[in-house]
């Protein structure tokens, strides 16, 4: 396994810290008026998403994590395990609910997702794009009559997620949604 020193920790580098994969969020060189220089490093744990602040000496070494990202197509689920197919090797990848929970509202068969693997085990999954096109299955008018903001209503989408949409959106129309914020972007058709 490859090693790197504190001064080689660049933003985005994936390393092993406390036997878990982490990504470097920031690395600041500090030269105090008195004493030895050091690095103030901020890491994000890739398994539990917690931020870690660490002070390192120049001589501190870290192992580079074997984290790879692959593009895979969602195939099917049995409600316990979600099955994806690697687009390059055509191997099946099995993802458990605790890993897939953040992308469940946007999960559609035959769509591509980016899966991060650490030691050949999935640790995270994201939609391959920041935007997704979904079909409006049902709309619920704004329940508060006389409300100041009556420019939006709730819409149930074909993945089961409910979001706010403009009042002109009808059942059966296709809309573009931002997967990061769960917000309506535009009407497609």
From Swiss-Prot:
InterPro entries: Elong-fact-P_C, NA-bd_OB-fold, Rib_uL2_dom2, Transl_elong_fac_P/YeiP, Transl_elong_KOW-like, Transl_elong_P/YeiP_cen, Transl_elong_P/YeiP_CS, Transl_elongation_fac_P
Recorded GO CC terms: cytoplasm
PTM entry text: May be beta-lysylated on the epsilon-amino group of Lys-34 by the combined action of EpmA and EpmB, and then hydroxylated on the C5 position of the same residue by EpmC (if this protein is present). Lysylation is critical for the stimulatory effect of EF-P on peptide-bond formation. The lysylation moiety may extend toward the peptidyltransferase center and stabilize the terminal 3-CCA end of the tRNA. Hydroxylation of the C5 position on Lys-34 may allow additional potential stabilizing hydrogen-bond interactions with the P-tRNA.
GO biological process terms, semicolon-separated: peptide biosynthetic process
Pathway: Protein biosynthesis; polypeptide chain elongation
Location within or outside the cell: Cytoplasm
Keyword list, A-Z: Cytoplasm, Elongation factor, Hydroxylation, Protein biosynthesis
Alphabetized Pfam families for the sequence: EFP, EFP_N, Elong-fact-P_C
Signal sequence annotation: none
GO molecular function: translation elongation factor activity
Keyword field contains Cytoplasm: yes
Positions bearing N6-(3,6-diaminohexanoyl)-5-hydroxylysine: 34
Gene3D superfamilies reported for this sequence: 2.30.30.30, Nucleic acid-binding proteins
Sequence similarity: Belongs to the elongation factor P family.
Purpose: Involved in peptide bond synthesis. Alleviates ribosome stalling that occurs when 3 or more consecutive Pro residues or the sequence PPG is present in a protein, possibly by augmenting the peptidyl transferase activity of the ribosome. Modification of Lys-34 is required for alleviation.
UniProt-listed HAMAP family: EF_P
Protein name: Elongation factor P
The organism of origin for this protein: Buchnera aphidicola subsp. Baizongia pistaciae (strain Bp)
